[in-house]
């Protein structure tokens, strides 16, 4: 079968070091049509399927429900809830197993807590986090106290994917005074791609794909890009595995330079020399094609017990491979 072009990924490492939350990834060359196939699939997965963490509920001392007002607090509870929904939190995979921070019993939930007693603003950096939790956007404004008064806010955070409404989150809550919120788990804020057509020859037109990805800091753009591809691959692998012969099929065309490097690494056993020629080469310390090509014709003629017939065989084999001995 005609093989598909092998493409490359270019990552702007300098830009990634300056701002890991934003990434530009160049993919190409791709055969015509594949830019839309890959671009759309990657974009959909990046925007909806990358796992993350989000606030799903909170409790405020002195407030029984979201339409209340708390004495001494500048904002009403609805405004405070909207501010807390913008929290970006990372949960360590090292401390929590898969699914552990999705639906544990509410009474055992690790809480992010802030207690304010003095008049003034309160920010995300003031939150006390349990082990394994980290607030990313520490400068996020949460609320202000207009007078000296003790107010405590407990924040419930869980892992998930996509978007979950407060109605769905409320089903987990069986306690008065805990206010459910909407949850946006996706750490990817923006993902777009651009297509550039490249004419590589009279008959061949290839496309170039450029992804631009921005995240909220809970995951780097590079990690999100790789994670999206991993999710797609894991979903497609079972389909490939339906047919073992197809599974083993190589459909991507190697570049000429890669084929050249791979052929150089061939053992001389793979070159189908006659026994006499093979033994002479082995005894002289030549084990790979690369070692053979490093020899000149004069070097070959000096190999002990190597006759004219074997010499001609070596020259012919090298020519068949489109190569030549050292001059």
Swiss-Prot record:
Keyword Transcription: yes
Highest taxon in the source lineage: Bacteria
Pfam hit, one: RNA_pol_A_CTD
Gene Ontology terms, MF aspect: DNA binding; DNA-directed RNA polymerase activity; protein dimerization activity
Entry EC no(s): 2.7.7.6
Family, per entry: Belongs to the RNA polymerase alpha chain family.
The record's note on its domains: The N-terminal domain is essential for RNAP assembly and basal transcription, whereas the C-terminal domain is involved in interaction with transcriptional regulators and with upstream promoter elements.
Protein name (record): DNA-directed RNA polymerase subunit alpha
Lineage, opening ranks: Bacteria, Bacillati, Mycoplasmatota, Mycoplasmoidales, Mycoplasmoidaceae
């Amino acid at each position: 079968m005609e093989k598909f072009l092998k493409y490359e990924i270019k990552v702007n490492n300098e830009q990634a070091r300056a701002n890991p939350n934003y990434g530009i990834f160049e993919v190409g060359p791709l055969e015509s049509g594949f830019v839309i196939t890959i671009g759309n699939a990657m974009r959909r997965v990046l925007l909806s399927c990358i796992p993350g963490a989000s606030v799903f509920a909170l409790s405020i001392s002195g407030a029984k429900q979201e339409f209340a007002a708390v004495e001494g607090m500048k904002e009403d509870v609805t405004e405070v809830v909207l501010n807390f929904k913008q929290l970006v939190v990372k949960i360590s995979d090292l401390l929590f197993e898969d699914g552990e921070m999705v639906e544990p019993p509410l009474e055992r939930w690790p809480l992010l807590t802030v207690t304010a007693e003095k008049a003034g603003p309160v920010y995300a950096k003031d939150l006390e986090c349990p082990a394994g939790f980290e607030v990313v956007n520490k400068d996020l404004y949460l609320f202000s106290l207009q007078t000296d008064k003790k107010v405590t806010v407990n924040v419930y955070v869980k892992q998930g994917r996509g978007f979950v409404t407060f109605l769905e989150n409320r089903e987990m809550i069986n306690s008065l005074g805990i206010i459910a919120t909407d949850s946006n788990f996706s750490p990817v804020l923006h993902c777009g791609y651009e297509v550039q057509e490249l004419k590589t020859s009279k008959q061949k037109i290839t496309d170039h794909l450029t992804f631009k990805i921005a995240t909220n800091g809970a995951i780097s753009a590079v990690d999100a890009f790789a994670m999206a591809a991993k999710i797609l691959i894991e979903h497609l692998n079972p389909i490939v595995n339906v047919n073992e012969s197809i599974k083993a099929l190589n459909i991507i065309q190697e570049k000429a330079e890669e084929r050249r490097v791979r052929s150089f690494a061939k053992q001389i056993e793979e070159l189908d020399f006659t026994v006499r020629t093979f033994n002479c080469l082995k005894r002289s310390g030549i084990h790979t094609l690369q070692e053979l090509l490093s020899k000149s014709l004069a070097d070959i003629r000096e190999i002990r017990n190597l006759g004219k017939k074997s010499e001609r065989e070596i020259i012919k084999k090298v020519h068949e491979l489109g190569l030549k001995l050292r001059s």
